[in-house]
Structures are given as C-alpha cells and as structure tokens.
Amino acid sequence: MRFLLYSRPGCGLCEEMLAGLAALPEARGVPVEVIDVDTDLNTRVRYGHKIPVLLFAGELVCHGHLDAEEVHKALAHHRRPV
C-alpha cells in the first residue's frame, strides 16, 4: 500500500503536505507517489482545483492541508488484522 499525493510543481501547500506526512511517525516507511495533476487532462479536471489531494489505498484521506488524524485512521483501517 502507498500514499498518492496529487500535486503540481511550485505548489507550496503540496510541499507542506509532503513534508508533514514524512514527519508523521505512523507514516514512516509507507511509500508516497507524487503525481503531477497537469500531466493528464482527466487527473487535472478531477483533482487540479483542490490540490494537494492525499489518497491511501485508493481512498481520499485529505485535501488542502494535511489532516494527521485522517492519516492515522486510514493507516489503522488498512493495518487491522483480518
């Protein structure tokens, strides 16, 4: 499992979200793929107006600003024993 961070070059909020995510102990070791919303029209239409957008396991975690509580919930949900 990995995080997907929809972003664009020069986006200060995106850089803040990435740095904040890296600082969360529970998120350490979880890969983060940064996706430039401007490389694909469909992606730009879907996410371009609300970047940064953070997903985990295909589900929205937060957008605009990092929500540490939502990151914690997403990780806990997917790390539960089955």
Tell what function each PLM region has.
Residues 59-82:
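Non-catalytic, surface beta->alpha helical segment in thiol-disulfide oxidoreductase systems
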